[in-house]
Each structure stands twice: as structure tokens, then as C-alpha cells.
């Protein structure tokens, strides 16, 4: 079948975005992997589908996310910003405020006058069973043994699971070595995204993220949210934090209460449109 798509990115975290409302789309894991392949397909970190919501009274669209390995996942913050720009540029909505259904629940997208997008990611989930993470009780950080060494990590779900490891220098952090080991750690039964966070000041961090099913990406929106939440509950960060990722900067705001939503603001860019037979 021939599929129309847009290639987009949020700070270099790139996506193939597909309108599945006005064209029939039913992707197998093999087809997702082909679309995501950077030599034989279009090339991307994730494939995003725009679908009709299951409950039109609660949301305007359904947002589905597939990693480059073909697996469907619950949430992607950078993708959410691209989703908002896509549905506006394609004329699917004229709204500035867009409620969207995801596998992790309803999120709210707000297109700002300058074109940036603020995403209400909802409240973080901090209890181990919500992440999911094997631990007896909720803590601000947890010891995690990896190949005989013990690391102190934060564990947060932003609709998808995240481990956050504080490092002295993000540039020299062992992302390629530790990332896949923590991602597949048995205490994370559904695997986990791994953030390496350097605290510059209470209002600024530097972050690299090893995404499950993808590897290291230039930016990760939910990873930025999780890092700020983890740093804030440990008393390291302010309510509003600039997060510098390899692909650029996001601004994250979280009041600090467990029930308070995490707000993420950043850009989204369309690179090109096209079609592909798969």
C-alpha cells in the first residue's frame, strides 16, 4: 500500500507522521521497522499515527507511537509536539488547544503564538507498581546493581518508564555502555528509558537519553520531564527548569506535588512530506 506521510522532528528526535484518518493504515511491526530504517525506508526514531479518538467527547484525536524496533509504546513528548503541528498544518483542526488520547491517558497540547507547543503531560507516576519497577516502596531514589556496580537512580513514569542517573559530566557519561544494561534490567519488567542528568544549577540541567527500543536520541521529551521530576523530588531543582539536550532546549515546569501536571514547552518542525509503498 502507498502511504502519505510527513517527516518531522522535535529537537532532532525525528518522526514519520501518518494521517490514519483519511487513508487506511494498518502497520505490522515489519512495516514500522521498514519505515524507520534510515537506508531502506524513510528513517526515524518513531512512527506516529493520527487516528480518530475512541471517545470524541474526551479527545479530538488518538495518538499512537511505534518505536523503530516495531513495538508500540505509551508516550512520546517530542512526538506530541509534532503531532500538534501536524494536525494543524494538515487542516485536521484549527484549535490552539488540542486534547489527545494516548495509551497512557489524555494529554493536552497547546500551540503557542510563536509556534512552540506546550504539552500537559499529566502528573508523574512515582509508585513502583505504576512505573513499573520492582521495589518494596516508593523512594526519591533507588540503588540499582548493574554488572557488580551499584548506581543510584530515580524511577519515574511519564506514561512510559524512565530511570534517571545523575552524572558529573553528561558529555563523558557512559551512555552507550550503561544505557542498554539499565534498559533491559530485570527490575524494569517492561524495559525502561534511561536518562543521564547533569545538574548545572537549580534551573538548568544537561541530559542525554537512551530510549528503549531506539538507542540514544538527540532529544526525549518524556525523558526531560522525568529528569526534572526526579531532580525536584530529590531537592536539586526549581519549579521551572531548562533542559539542554543534544538537539536543543526544552523548558519543563512541575509544581512538585505528585498530583500536579508536568508541562513541557519546545519546538516542532516539519522537514518534508512524501509517500512510500510498503
From Swiss-Prot:
Membership in a protein family: Belongs to the diaminopimelate epimerase family.
Q: What is its EC number?
A: 5.1.1.7
Question: What is the protein named?
Answer: Diaminopimelate epimerase
The pathway it acts in is: Amino-acid biosynthesis; L-lysine biosynthesis via DAP pathway; DL-2,6-diaminopimelate from LL-2,6-diaminopimelate: step 1/1
Q: Where does substrate bind?
A: 13, 46, 67, 77-78, 160, 193, 211-212, 221-222
Role noted for this protein: Catalyzes the stereoinversion of LL-2,6-diaminopimelate (L,L-DAP) to meso-diaminopimelate (meso-DAP), a precursor of L-lysine and an essential component of the bacterial peptidoglycan.
**PANTHER family noted in UniProt:** DIAMINOPIMELATE EPIMERASE, DIAMINOPIMELATE EPIMERASE, CHLOROPLASTIC
UniProt keywords (A-Z) are: Amino-acid biosynthesis, Cytoplasm, Isomerase, Lysine biosynthesis
Amino acid at each position: 500500500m502507498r502511504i502519505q506521510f510527513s517527516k518531522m522532528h522535535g529537537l532532532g528526535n525525528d518522526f514519520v507522521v501518518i494521517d490514519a484518518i483519511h487513508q487506511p493504515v494498518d502497520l505490522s511491526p515489519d512495516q514500522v521497522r521498514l519505515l524507520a530504517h534510515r537506508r531502506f525506508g524513510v528513517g526515524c526514531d518513531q512512527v506516529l499515527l493520527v487516528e480518530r479518538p475512541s471517545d470524541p467527547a474526551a479527545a479530538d484525536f488518538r495518538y499512537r507511537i511505534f518505536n523503530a524496533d516495531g513495538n508500540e509504546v505509551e508516550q512520546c513528548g517530542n512526538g506530541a509536539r509534532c503531532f500538534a503541528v501536524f494536525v494543524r498544518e494538515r487542516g485536521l483542526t484549527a484549535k490552539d488547544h488540542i486534547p489527545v488520547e494516548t495509551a497512557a491517558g489524555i494529554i493536552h497540547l497547546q500551540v503557542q503564538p510563536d509556534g512552540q507547543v506546550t504539552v500537559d503531560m499529566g502528573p508523574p507516576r512515582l509508585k513502583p507498581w505504576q512505573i513499573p519497577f520492582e521495589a518494596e516502596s516508593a523512594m526519591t531514589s533507588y540503588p540499582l546493581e548493574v554488572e557488580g556496580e551499584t548506581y543510584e537512580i530515580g524511577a519515574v513514569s511519564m506514561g512510559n518508564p524512565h530511570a534517571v542517573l545523575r552524572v558529573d559530566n553528561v558529555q563523558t557519561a557512559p551512555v552507550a555502555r550503561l544505557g542498554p544494561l539499565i534498559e533491559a534490567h530485570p527490575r524494569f519488567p517492561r524495559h525502561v528509558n534511561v536518562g543521564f542528568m547533569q545538574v548545572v544549577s537549580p534551573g538548568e540541567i544537561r541530559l542525554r537519553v537512551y530510549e528503549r527500543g531506539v538507542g540514544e536520541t538527540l532529544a526525549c521529551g518524556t525523558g526531560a520531564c522525568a529528569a526534572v521530576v526526579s531532580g525536584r523530588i530529590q531537592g536539586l531543582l526549581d519549579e521551572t527548569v531548562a533542559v539542554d539536550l543534544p538537539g536543543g532546549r526544552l523548558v519543563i515546569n512541575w509544581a512538585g506535588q505528585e498530583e500536579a501536571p508536568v508541562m513541557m514547552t519546545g519546538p516542532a518542525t516539519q522537514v518534508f512530506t512524501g509517500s512510500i509503498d510498503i
